[in-house]
Amino acid sequence: MTTLHILGFPRVGAKRELKFAQERYWRKELAEQDLLDLAKALREKNWLHQAQADADFVTVGDFTFYDHILDLQVATGAIPARFGFDSQTLSLDQYFQLARGNKEQFAIEMTKWFDTNYHYLVPEFQKNTTFKANPTHYVNQIREAKAAGHQVKPVIVGPLTFLWLGKEKGEAFNRFDLLKQLVPIYFEILTALAAEGVEWIQIDEPALALDLPQEWLAAYQDVYAQLAKVNAKLLLATYFGSVAEHADLLKALPVDGLHLDLVRAPEQLSAFEDYPKVLSAGVIDGRNIWRANLNRVLDVLEPLKAKFNQRLWIAPSCSLLHTPYDLAVETQLQQNNPELYRWLAFTLQKVAELQVLKQALNAGRDAVTEQLNDSQTAADARANSNVIHKAEVAQRLANLPANADKRQSPFAERIKLQNKWLNLPLLPTTNIGSFPQTLEIRHARAAFKKGELSLADYEAAMKKEIEFVVRKQEELDLDVLVHGEGERNDMVEYFGELLDGFAFTKFGWVQSYGSRCVKPPVIYGDVTRPEPMTVRWSQYAQSLTDKVMKGMLTGPVTILQWSFVRNDIPRSTVCKQIGVALSDEVLDLEKAGIKVIQIDEPAIREGLPLKRADWDAYLQWAGEAFRLSYMGVKDDTQIHTHMCYSEFNDILPAIAGLDADVITIETSRSDMELLTAFADFKYPNDIGPGVYDIHSPRVPTAGEIEHLLRKALKVIPKERLWVNPDCGLKTRGWKETIEQLQVMVEVTKKLRAELAE
């Protein structure tokens, strides 16, 4: 018989029940016991869904109140010493303080979990870190599930991935040196799990899909030789990429089974067809929301079944944490877009797909004819749908002129033309894009969406807000103005709602971090722009002032990265389609007299593949898609872009290759360190390093901004330097925003006068 198991389940519930309970608990509106009871009910529901789908085990240890890597920091005693907490007796309140900070200590840093849109809390390792086992989190969940009558498989992230994901703090050392102390602690934790009578323990080592240094790879053999002494079988799970280059290493490891991601890297299967133990085939996509073509999946699985027999397990490619909970609650989508609805599968539907596959492998395809026919019909409909495939989009991409993604003239010539009409002072000041969104604005948007506010009243509310934002900027004496983006709920969703080829769910939430969830748009078809999206707002804003108004768009790579993307054509093609659609908007803005246009790309870096060897291909198509978004603009139109993150050094040639006339970047928190990379690289175009951190309500002193600007002037010629905040101001309040910008403008004017002398 084929074994069915799940690597992990979403934690937040079908309608974000956990999120709302957590937030009520933090506001002291919910008792701790009530939060614990709700969490238990959610776990029981998750286990029941797995059991009802004929899973051979239910997975435990995957549920967390905030983050599974934070749970591991507690379980190994590796919580940051700076908090002064005892990991053995940690309270729920203290646990949340680690994640959210308190009056004395800032929160543990967050970063992206591999190349997903989930964030984990980065372990802080010090030279003198001492580990201490506390398996309570896992043991309690095992007991809970067993008490409910389930067969149980606990999951824990492995020691090498855990160490790799952390950062060294304090005195310089290599965190790899902590491995020999960490492994006995893992042994202690696994021994406690085995003592609960579990047959299998799943140990996740996704770091194997990265370019790990040789000494880290070499350590796997010894680490797992020690862990294999535990009185339970070990399933080593890899995902997010191919581990084929480590096939010899993995075959020799003393574990009892291996999980492979055959969705992200189907080609790696050939390297493991002689694997002598349990092979878990990750055949259902754990990171996207499309139904699988089950006949095609069986074409892969049936030969494996013949070869591996009882040793074949089936599973999703990775944890289902990255997919929404249940398609069945999307009644609105089912009514409005029944065709698209039939092509989708959320977590519960994916579990059901695995159940069908298990039945087919155990009893033959005839046992599930109806389900297989239904799957095939949906796949065929999707392949041939004219809702998805638009001949004119494919033609337009195929017939782009040879240098469609190149400006007419090089930057040195363009900037002269731009400066001539812009007539800006030295060190021009601007804002990144958004201004604070008041409750009033949010209410107006929501009421309009629900049909409670007429179009005329909605437009009046937005125009009133735009005028307010423009007047405030004039009072502050900023040089290049923005309209404030009051009409936008989210920088991707706003454009997705106005572009063809996108759809939206009502409950398609996935966890981003802690209680924060995001609802990505669904890109299901060829992308086009049926009509202008931003022109009237920017045009209205420009009509209110003689100062230069900047148009604001979200770039193609960011729209791609923050959406669920169709899987029937390459991501690169989808990205170029978005770029071409945006170019229509850019040209319409230009025609309307908006000749400074910003195309934001905060997500270009996070799209980088996990393996370095794949970077160039990605950066090439991502860069092309970005340049296509402004194709055809005149030389005297100034294109800006904005990026927010701290690591640029390794992709600077690609950033320069975007050929934006002005790039604004987040630099204040790193004390302008980032700029040295731009200077060493001799970055050729204009640059606006952020001079204060917008993530805090604190108003910077004149001295702080002056210090940063003087640092910037040391490495960037004054003629090419812009002055701006780090990021958009949407999440700030108006009071601190005005005060922050006042300081920024005053310091700029002081330095301007000095430079003029």
UniProtKB/Swiss-Prot annotation:
Entry annotation: catalytic residues: 695 (proton donor)
Cofactor, free-text remark: Binds 1 zinc ion per subunit.
Sample GO molecular function, one term: 5-methyltetrahydropteroyltriglutamate-homocysteine S-methyltransferase activity
Gene3D superfamilies listed in its UniProt record: 3.20.20.210
Domain of life according to the entry: Bacteria
NCBIfam families assigned to the protein according to its UniProt record, in alphabetical order: met_syn_B12ind, PRK05222.1
Cofactor field: Zn(2+)
Pathway field: Amino-acid biosynthesis; L-methionine biosynthesis via de novo pathway; L-methionine from L-homocysteine (MetE route): step 1/1
Binding site for L-homocysteine: 432-434, 485, 600
Pfam families reported in the protein's UniProt record: Meth_synt_1 (PF08267), Meth_synt_2 (PF01717)
EC number of this enzyme: 2.1.1.14
Binding site for L-methionine: 432-434, 485, 600
Residues annotated as binding 5-methyltetrahydropteroyltri-L-glutamate: 16-19, 112, 516-517, 562, 606
Protein name according to UniProt: 5-methyltetrahydropteroyltriglutamate--homocysteine methyltransferase
Signal peptide limits: none
Task performed by this protein: Catalyzes the transfer of a methyl group from 5-methyltetrahydrofolate to homocysteine resulting in methionine formation.
Gene assigned in the entry: metE
One GO biological process term: methionine biosynthetic process
Catalytic activity: 5-methyltetrahydropteroyltri-L-glutamate + L-homocysteine = tetrahydropteroyltri-L-glutamate + L-methionine
Record organism: Actinobacillus pleuropneumoniae serotype 5b (strain L20)
